[in-house]
């Protein structure tokens, strides 16, 4: 791991649940703007998606709700009051003074852990239109300069270097690096093409919207 400035989150790190929530909000803002901001139920489903998530989680509404309240207190999410349901949106750009490309990259790192430049280029196609890996490297180095991301040197058996976010606890970050080292190329998360993952994620989002609509209808019956 290269030497970088200390993370501003070192004394009050994000939990794994916090990171999953923020990453999910960043993703859905870009991929399903018609349903964003998200209701609590929609956010739980987004956090627990089987695609584009590493690791896959099984969070409860209670866990997500508690984390949202903590993130709101830190100025990283905002509650949007609605006539039918309250909704949540992230405020990473304002809260951390980030430009859109940096928000997109942090979102991906929150959702999938350490990743190569090529992985980030492929997986970011629905979040931000990056020209090439060098543009991604530029924004990652800007994040690293503020202690929000770090460059990981290539390890034995790996073909490419990786980057990871630095907003989590030391234990979580070490676990992510260890998991990366135990299976250098981590074939399973990359087994699906980016297009296939996008289609599956879109179907999961549509299903979540239908379930939410059904719940509202049943509640009004």
UniProtKB/Swiss-Prot annotation:
InterPro entries: DUF480 (IPR007432), WH-like_DNA-bd_sf (IPR036388), WH_DNA-bd_sf (IPR036390)
Pfam families referenced in this protein's UniProt entry, alphabetically: DUF480
Similarity-based family: Belongs to the UPF0502 family.
The protein, known as: UPF0502 protein PA3453
